[in-house]
């Protein structure tokens, strides 16, 4: 019996959630990382009070107000919303103000798309108002359908269908003998950030780019179209930015790297590097169908074909297209609303929470569905302050402006306050839209254990289990489509924490994580709110209250999840970072890089063998001719040993720190220990910065994080260990070798910092 109880004790320490529940989501008895027993119990009680406050009725009314009119950058209602948010922050007791930045925000003055041959056709480029949708008729205030930061252009040329417009699609076109030089390409939305499509098209010699919403992706293939169902109607169009942010930087194109304040030195428009090289225009599938139907040439590969009732040909031509776009290149104000609750013990350590308030049109789902949760969190925290709660650290709530054009408000704020943030910012927590379904968690892996712990304390409104358990079971259900479902299901059932997603870009955490190196989380619910109204006039209160989180219970769950996270981070005696999962994840990235290289080596060896054997000639269909692929050199061996050694060192330090924290927990509240916690927490705040490099990534110095970055040719999608991974993908093998050395050095520095933190803890406990 003694050994049995020893085993039980061990598992309660390692996997506490398996043995102690959350007392029906009241005050849990599970120990909190970074808290002494007494402080942990007090924190649990305050958190329970907090989670009882958010009210779905308030969320609904906030959304009705904030999405009542179009509120894009430069609009009257955008400023009105900022002032409304400011007034509410102040009413709730927060110290709040607006910070204004002046940014380049183009709006269209000319949009023309017409087919000149073989038949005449002029695209509507309009989204019609719907009688049942009260705000869809606000035409005078709506932004037209366009892609921001497209260059002005007036071009004529043959049309070529390029699937999703990614580099691998152009490789297939090469095999078909199709060139896009001098052509206008038409690409489908999705499978990458939209700005990648004109970037790759221009690199291949195209003179213009159209992007359309394919019904197979977000239209009638999935469900009824709006207003009968949630999907994109035939005339629905996805607006959006095509700024080349991943290659250059997000934020104002005229003030890269510095805040867009009135006295900032601005580039001339012609010198702005993130504007597209060719004109771009988004269109509906209603406008795309006649253009695609007029194409001839080879049939598109089967996987390229969509669900429009036409044969999908590649071209070029005989469709000849005229595209003309011109813009008002104006400087417009953005209004960031910043609110603060001062810390009582460590006011110089900041926990920052943000969501944007601007939309492309009415923007109920994106972004107001999560902005309302942020507001209800702020109201609830203000209520706790009035009841006597005093956060240990300073809490900063941010309602960003200008996110949609490309993270303007948050980037300019971070660039303006970069030195302060490097000194004071502990964690940034982001949301950007919320729906109904399963909690998704992304972020810095030093926070993986922390956010898993929070998720175990929140009730899912539909199933009444924890949002953590629902996320776990959903991942188990989805594992059947994985390459190794058995191994994945085993990990999901046995690993103490669910793996959180690495972060690329696409929302307001980007400058915090990728530029300054602030540990970050990005959270939201979704999966049961499929829809096709993204960035259209139909993303409004009517759509959201009919097809998404109609009772706003998931808006409340988001407020409970994020607000609990904010409180737990703000109140912890020791910031609840854990580095064991970071080390484990980094080692996983190393193994994936080695496999990526090995797979690429074998792929090229096999292709060269097939060329030698004459396989391509033997299998050529003369009625469907293709071009043989070019012979390539097999990639060289890369030495991953420095990275492996660095990860092993990081693992040892992480375990040492974890052990030291466990041994010191009971004495964290002692005066002698408390006096030394400031130095320890400063080391922990520094830990994410150690994973950055002041010189940045190759050819994009604004991006400084060596573990996470948006992909140059994927955009929002993350590239982990980006310098090495993209070096391999882009066949820059010498550069990849150099990046292995840089990453290894950063990991060694991280290991040394964590080892120092462990010794600080051990010294404090003596």
What kind of feature is each model-predicted range?
Residues 159-231, 344-350, 360, 375-376, ...:
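A conserved hydrophobic secondary-structure block that centers on an alpha-helix together
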């Amino acid at each position: 019996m003694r050994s049995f109880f020893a085993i039980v004790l061990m598992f309660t320490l390692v996997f506490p959630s398996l043995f102690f529940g959350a007392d029906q989501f009241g005050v849990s008895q599970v120990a909190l990382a970074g808290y002494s027993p007494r402080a942990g119990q007090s924190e649990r009680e305050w958190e329970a009070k907090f989670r009882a406050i958010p009210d779905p009725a308030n969320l609904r009314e906030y959304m009705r107000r904030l999405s009542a009119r179009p509120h894009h950058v430069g609009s009257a209602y955008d400023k009105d919303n900022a002032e409304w948010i400011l007034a509410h922050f102040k009413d709730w007791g927060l110290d709040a103000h607006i910070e204004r930045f002046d940014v380049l925000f183009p709006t269209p003055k000319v949009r023309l798309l017409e087919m000149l041959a073989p038949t005449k056709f002029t695209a509507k480029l309009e989204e019609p108002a719907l009688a049942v949708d009260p705000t869809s008729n606000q035409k005078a205030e709506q932004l037209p359908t366009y892609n921001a930061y497209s260059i002005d252009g007036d071009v004529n040329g043959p049309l070529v269908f390029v699937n999703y417009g990614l580099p691998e699609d152009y490789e297939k076109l090469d095999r078909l003998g199709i060139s896009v030089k001098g052509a206008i390409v038409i690409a489908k939305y999705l499978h990458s950030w939209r700005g990648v499509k004109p970037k790759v098209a221009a690199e291949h010699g195209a003179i213009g780019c159209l992007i359309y919403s394919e019904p197979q992706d977000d239209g009638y293939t999935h469900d009824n179209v709006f207003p009968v169902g949630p999907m994109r109607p035939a005339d629905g169009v996805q607006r959006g930015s095509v700024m080349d942010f991943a290659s250059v930087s997000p934020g104002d194109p005229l003030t890269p790297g510095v805040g867009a304040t009135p006295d900032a030195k601005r580039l001339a428009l012609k010198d702005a590097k993130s504007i597209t090289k060719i004109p771009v225009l988004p269109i509906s599938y209603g406008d795309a169908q006649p253009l695609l139907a007029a194409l001839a040439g080879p049939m598109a590969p089967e996987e390229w074909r969509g669900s429009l009732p036409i044969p999908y040909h590649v071209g070029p031509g005989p469709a000849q297209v005229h595209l003309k776009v011109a813009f008002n290149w104006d400087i417009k104000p953005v209004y960031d609303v910043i609110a603060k609750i001062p810390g009582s013990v460590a006011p110089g350590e900041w926990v920052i929470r943000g969501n944007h308030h601007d939309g492309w049109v009415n923007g109920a789902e994106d972004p107001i569905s999560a902005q309302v949760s942020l507001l209800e969190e702020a109201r609830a925290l203000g209520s706790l302050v009035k009841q006597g709660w005093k956060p240990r650290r300073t809490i900063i709530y941010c309602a960003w402006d200008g996110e949609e054009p490309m993270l303007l408000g948050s980037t300019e704020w971070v660039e303006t306050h970069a030195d302060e943030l490097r000194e004071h910012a502990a964690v940034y927590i982001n949301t950007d839209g919320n729906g109904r379904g399963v909690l998704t968690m992304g972020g810095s892996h030093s926070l993986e254990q922390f956010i898993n712990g929070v998720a175990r304390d929140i009730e899912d409104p539909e199933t009444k289990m924890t949002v953590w358990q629902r996320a776990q079971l959903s991942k188990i259900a989805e594992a059947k489509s994985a390459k190794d479902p058995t191994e994945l299901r085993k990990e999901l059932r046995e690993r103490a924490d669910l793996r959180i997603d690495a972060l690329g870009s696409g929302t307001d955490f980007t400058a915090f994580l990728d530029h300054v190196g602030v540990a970050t989380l990005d959270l939201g619910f979704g999966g049961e709110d499929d829809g096709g109204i993204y960035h259209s006039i139909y993303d409004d209160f009517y759509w959201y209250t009919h097809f998404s989180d109609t009772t706003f219970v998931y808006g409340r769950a988001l407020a409970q999840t994020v607000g609990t996270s904010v409180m737990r981070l703000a109140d912890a005696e020791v910031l609840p970072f854990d580095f064991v999962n970071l080390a484990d994840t980094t080692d996983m990235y190393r193994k994936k890089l080695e496999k990526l290289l090995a797979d690429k080596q074998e792929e090229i060896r096999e292709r060269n063998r097939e060329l030698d054997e004459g396989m391509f000639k033997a299998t050529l269909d003369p009625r469907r001719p293709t071009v043989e692929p070019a012979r390539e050199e097999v990639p060289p061996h890369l030495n991953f040993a420095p990275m492996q050694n660095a990860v092993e060192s990081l693992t040892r330090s992480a375990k040492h720190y974890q052990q030291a924290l466990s041994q010191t927990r009971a004495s964290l509240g002692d005066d002698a220990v408390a006096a030394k916690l400031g130095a320890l927490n400063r080391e922990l705040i520094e830990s994410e910065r150690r994973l950055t490099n002041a010189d940045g990534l190759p050819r994009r110095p604004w991006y400084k994080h060596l573990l996470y970055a948006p992909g140059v040719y994927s955009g929002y999608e993350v590239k982990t260990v980006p310098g090495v991974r993209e070096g391999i993908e882009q066949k820059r093998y010498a550069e990849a070798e150099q990046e292995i050395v840089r990453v290894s050095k950063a990991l060694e520095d991280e290991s040394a910092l964590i080892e120092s933190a462990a010794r600080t803890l051990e010294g404090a406990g003596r």
